[in-house]
């Protein structure tokens, strides 16, 4: 033991918090952090001789008041071998715990703090052993141990407490706790009456040694009486067959309830309408009427809560990675038929332009003659006639004639498909409905034949292939504006139809 550092003796089996051995190592250096401030505060709260310095606040669960701040600071400085310790420094250390969510300051009350037992502070140290020595108010935290059993009254209308708000106490419990602070024996008497009176039914089927341990050893003397709404958590046995599960199979047969999947009190998913505590967490949604721990269950339980405290910074809805943990289903599950209505339904693609042309052409192919459709060649880019010599123009005209004659034997469906792929446009209406005329592609070819008879004149027939595809009226207008010789030919009655006028037109149509 270091000189000048009087370390508080390790409590014997009689009472107080028993922290792990490393918290009391005498060889630890002065100022070491082997014991934390909140450990020390809990230690002082459990000791009867420091009741005038720091004590639990009556009526509030986990709340304590520092009656003599300077004395508490002096005791803490002596424990940590820091004689210059004062309450300002100690309060800064307490504010550090605000962020850690271990405790918080009670608003409106001086020197009053409250432990956040919903963060399960104590299971940080799973082997803490509690034995009450003396009078402890009801706000003192109950802590389960592996050597004790805890039993809770059932949910019925004749419960000794009437307050349904968790974490609070009814008037009767507050007056009882006030009497307990003056006389320690009244507490045990009242508890024994509670054992005999209101807990007759939930003691059935439970180890008879548990009640003796609870009363004789004062095991439930420090325990807060739960409100009516508090119920056991683990409802169905055999829920965790996995040996790695944090919970063992309960030896007591469970009863079905609204929420049948057990949830660990170390998880924040458990509804917050009741107060959390490091004692066995109880769910208000199960209707079992008895609850007990065996040592193996308690070992798993404390381990799981310790893991929860170590992971306190995680999201409130995150789960520790337990292999056997079963997550309860959501309450607002959608029906299968409702969930399927949002699925994406793939529809067949719409009929393309090519397929539409094919369907329309099959319907219109009857009144249209095959040579008329066959006379429309593929759209090919042709250089203007002004850039070519007359010899090349004659050769191109012959090739076009042969090409149109060969295409005349091709079935109409194939030509219509070819036409659809190249350019889809409605057919031009004929100028003279009563007289069948040849298609535009034949007209420039006849002009080229006429141009062969007159080699001195530059032919205008094979200008561009686009001219062969344009309507006859537009082509006539263009030639009328561009070619002065065409005007003279039209005046003399020899325009485009080999100088035969309407008679030549009818003859050409008959030949076609």
Curated annotation (Swiss-Prot):
Belongs to the ETS family. Residues 35-116 bind DNA. Residues 443-452 have a biased composition (Acidic residues). This is ETS translocation variant 3. Signal peptide: none annotated. Residues 136-222, 336-512 are annotated as: Disordered. GO terms for biological process: cell differentiation; cellular response to granulocyte macrophage colony-stimulating factor stimulus; negative regulation of cell population proliferation; regulation of transcription by RNA polymerase II. GO terms for molecular function: DEAD/H-box RNA helicase binding; DNA-binding transcription factor activity, RNA polymerase II-specific; DNA-binding transcription repressor activity, RNA polymerase II-specific; RNA polymerase II transcription regulatory region sequence-specific DNA binding. The modification Phosphoserine is found at residues 139, 159, 315. It is found in: Nucleus. The modification N6-acetyllysine is found at residue 388. It comes from the Eukaryota. GO terms for cellular component: chromatin; nucleoplasm; nucleus; RNA polymerase II transcription repressor complex.
